[in-house]
């Protein structure tokens, strides 16, 4: 039972919802109550979160090496224990040193528990057959904010922000730790997995070993650019379009469509993307982002333009998450997969940490139209990187 694909996917899906919901999304709800109660600026509160992202980038490669040596079960279990301790530290913080230390702990935990570690665990068990399970797993992760934003909100209302962080810590400890411990042990290869016979040999990677660094560089540029866009707009989209003349209520409900279409994009990939050329898949996911920004970069802030943006933006983000997990597997093979994800994650985490402050500066200095032009150009850079990847390495595969 515990070694079956349905159990593994369900267990990892639950733990991704809980881990993302607590370690990444909880701060969105609890930042202001913390700032008011502790007397700290919201800038400092979010600085702690940025420190977590930077730490995640620093420890990404050591964490990947540990996973490759000791396996996903031990890595994920340790990550859950570390994560619950970091969340507990947040609930007890009364000075700034402890607060920053808590985020440092959570930065380490995130590299041991979130998508990259879960993707690598699936590849450990299923090899190249993990592509479809990776796509399915991303559907679970898309629910994290939908579930944990209300949990954190109502917990804060009922028992305060400290109690809310304790709820987060308990969720990780009680739900994630035992589910991770039930994963198959290191070295086990699942014979009955998705798609093909478990005994069949893996096909040759599409990217030859001597060109691996070049391909990783191009993918890293694409992922870092998209991480910058996603994080910057998560923080600033609503106030930016309000300054363009849109009501706050309209901006709010339009922005909320992003999550719905992010999940829809992942679901469509599951239905129609099984045999899609990985280079084409990457081009489509980043190309949609370029199209999404075109009307906003031109200064359009009408409701139809904003609706079209949210729909296309959400679909693009949903697809890019799958690209991040599945395409490297096809391009580079299963061997060293965790290390490849770590190499791809590091620049993206740095971009994510810098994005809110950098984009706020652009908006303050030049306004939202220039800000959307910047996002449009960053999207073009991402699309250009995937086009260059396809031009350099496509071998007529499907």
Per-range role (PLM):
Residues 81-94, 288-300:
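C-terminal ends and interior cores of transmembrane alpha-helices
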Residues 275-327:
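C-terminal transmembrane helical hairpin of 12-TM major facilitator-type secondary transporters
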Residues 58-71, 265-277, 363-364:
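Helix-to-loop junctions at the C-terminal end of transmembrane segments
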Residues 34-35, 66-67, 150-159, 241-242, ...:
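Interfacial helix-cap and linker-helix signal at transmembrane-aqueous boundaries
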Residues 27-31, 212-267:
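Extracytoplasmic gate region of multi-pass secondary transporters
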Residues 34, 112-126, 319-332:
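Intracellular juxtamembrane helix-capping segments at the cytosolic ends
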Residues 140-187:
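Helix-loop-helix hairpin linking two adjacent transmembrane segments in secondary transporters
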Residues 17, 97-113, 224, 305-318:
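Hydrophobic core of transmembrane alpha-helices in multi-pass small-molecule transporters
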